[in-house]
């Protein structure tokens, strides 16, 4: 898996294909109707937002943790005083202790590499947005929520 850098490279590749080969990019326009294309691009934007939270950023002893996992652990930690302990034989729920251990155990070089990859995402998304806007104009999908998710991801990794 190539993480945030792979995601950025994929968006950049798709932007280039849209610029250079729009008439042949799947799904094809149906006599000027771009509804399927817009739907496919919306799907890509949704997946990009999801991946921003789901890609692994920390390596624990038995699993990797994503930004979504960190959020979940933080929420559980805040609600821990009201929660019952896990049933015997069931794994303990995700905890801030596990996240803290993973933060200590994840090599700094890995974290810096993840951050470098994530920092490529805003430009890659901007390239795709420009390519789509050039071809579809107002008919194209909105990029704002994906742009916000990408920006939030970069900000969180910079902390």
Explain the meaning of each model-derived region.
Residues 1-5, 13-159:
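Polyanionic, low-complexity intrinsically disordered segments
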């Amino acid at each position: 898996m190539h993480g945030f850098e792979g995601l950025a490279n994929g968006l950049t590749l798709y932007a280039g294909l849209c610029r250079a080969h729009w008439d042949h990019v799947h799904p094809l326009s149906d006599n000027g109707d771009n509804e399927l294309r817009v739907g496919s691009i919306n799907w890509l934007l949704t997946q990009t937002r999801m991946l921003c939270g789901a890609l692994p950023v920390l390596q624990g002893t038995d699993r990797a943790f994503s930004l979504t996992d960190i959020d979940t652990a933080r929420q559980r930690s805040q609600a821990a005083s009201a929660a019952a302990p896990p049933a015997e034989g069931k794994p303990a729920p995700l905890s801030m202790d596990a996240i803290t251990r993973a933060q200590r155990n994840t090599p700094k070089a890995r974290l810096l590499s993840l951050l470098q990859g994530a920092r490529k995402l805003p430009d890659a998304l901007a390239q795709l947005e420009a390519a789509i806007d050039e071809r579809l104009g107002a008919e194209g999908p909105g990029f704002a929520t994906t742009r916000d998710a990408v920006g939030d991801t970069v900000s969180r990794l910079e902390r």
